[in-house]
């Protein structure tokens, strides 16, 4: 968990000292935006290759190598300030990040105690927001972004050495399974391999599948307006979140004139942790009160939350008071995250069970391509062009982009209502 947390901390380091990074690398807002987006490109390429590499190479040494590579990308700032070279290492930083991000939750699922798996999986997912806050706070108090990166690099390397001395079986589910499966009535190791068990299960599943009627094709389901509008709605939220997280430090210093360590650290910690957590819990609870995300009214609930998020977005860039800014930003995160569990639930509910994995992959890929990837660069280009006349314009547009989500949530409600009516007419 600690390694996973540190692996997710680099975004917080960049957010804490944006102006310092621009000065050290001698770049402007446009280049700084691309500096953020290139990491997402690395993550996309890493995601496409990680599962292949994990299946063909020793997992322990692969994870060890990925963490060593990640640490080296943090230390490059002590060697050179050349922007093109830094960008290559930023790409590698995103590429190496994926290995632990993908494998550690899988490791918990394979080796975690059965009755604690859900808790352990949820716990390890908190590493991402906590890591971002840790990186932000550590860099804020250290005073320099390269010191923040150095702290992450040497801490990860130290913990990485511990992984190196762990037995291989802790990284390979097949070895672990083979060594520990026993036949109770004989008290000896089972002679059945994973492949034999999987083959038997596969035959059973194929027999069950042959009895079921064929449903709509995968692409027809993924291109349905109900699914497409939900995916795009999540993409809009991820775009606003990414732009906000990446540029929040710049906004603190240049628009609000706040460079105090305590103010920046406390506000970022509050809105980044408490807002999303309380929002997700509240949204899920309210949705359950209205019958859950399987009901068409859940889309209308997202529409209401989206309007409340949009109202917060309108006023957040208008205020100068740090207190009011904190309250409004908290409300923005709170109401936006009220939608997230409902949107995820609807996206799973509107496709057949057999393609839920494919729908999840499409959902994640779209959020990265249309949300996380372009957000830092788009914000940077707007900020570079208009910051002399309006330092808050980029943040205003980034936050109010959430109104597109409002339109999509209403459209989703309309399409679900239409499908329900068509089903009733057919019956």
Which residues does each PLM region occupy?
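Conserved MFS/SLC helix-loop-helix module at the cytosolic interface between two early adjacent transmembrane helices
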Residues: 45-83
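Helix-loop-helix hairpin linking two adjacent transmembrane segments in secondary transporters
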Residues: 124-172
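Residue-level signature of mid-helix packing/kink "hotspots" within the transmembrane helices
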Residues: 12, 39-48, 98, 132-133, ...
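Structural signature of the two symmetry-related core transmembrane helices
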Residues: 61-75, 297-314
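Extracytoplasmic gate region of multi-pass secondary transporters
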Residues: 14-15, 224-281, 337-340, 344, ...
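Cytoplasmic helix-loop-helix junction between adjacent transmembrane helices
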Residues: 89-128
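Symmetry-related core transmembrane helices of the 12-TM Major Facilitator Superfamily/SLC fold
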Residues: 147-165, 393-412
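Extracytoplasmic
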Residues: 2-29, 244-249, 375
